[in-house]
């Protein structure tokens, strides 16, 4: 249930951005959640609804989640691609097994809609 600690940090980050931008209210929070992030979206939403109640700035914020697909990069030929299956072990161009995940294994804050004072 690491979703609760992640959302707690997300709310704190939102409050920081609001303060920095002299906003008194955040209306919308848009996050990208990678398909390999090990994040349970229903728990994430539940945690957000719980934690936003404790924040004056985020109390009425709407949460939008963007699903982010995995993106891979081959370290041998530099080819960047999105795999068609869950087989992340082979480059589709040169067939090397030297590939890394470059996107889709994290949760990112993509944007905030705020009301300035």
Curated annotation (Swiss-Prot):
Phenotype upon gene inactivation: Mutant has negligible hydrogenase activity and is severely impaired in urease activity.
Subunit structure: Monomer and homodimer. Forms a complex with HypB.
Family: Belongs to the HypA/HybF family.
Impact upon substituting residue 79 to A: Does not affect nickel-binding ability
A GO term, aspect molecular function: zinc ion binding
InterPro entries the UniProt entry points to: Hydgase_Ni_incorp_HypA/HybF_CS, HypA/HybF
KW Secreted (keyword) present: no
Sorted UniProt keywords: Metal-binding, Nickel, Zinc
HAMAP family given in the database record: HypA_HybF (MF_00213)
PANTHER family named in the record: HYDROGENASE MATURATION FACTOR HYPA (PTHR34535:SF3)
Binding site residues for Ni(2+): 2-3, 40
Sites where the protein binds Zn(2+): 74, 77, 91, 94
Protein name (database record): Hydrogenase/urease maturation factor HypA
Gene3D superfamilies: 3.30.2320.80
Role, per record: Involved in the maturation of [NiFe] hydrogenases. Required for nickel insertion into the metal center of the hydrogenase. Is also required for urease maturation.
Keyword Zinc attached: yes
Single GO biological process annotation from the record: protein modification process
Recorded consequence of changing residue 95 to A: Does not affect nickel-binding ability
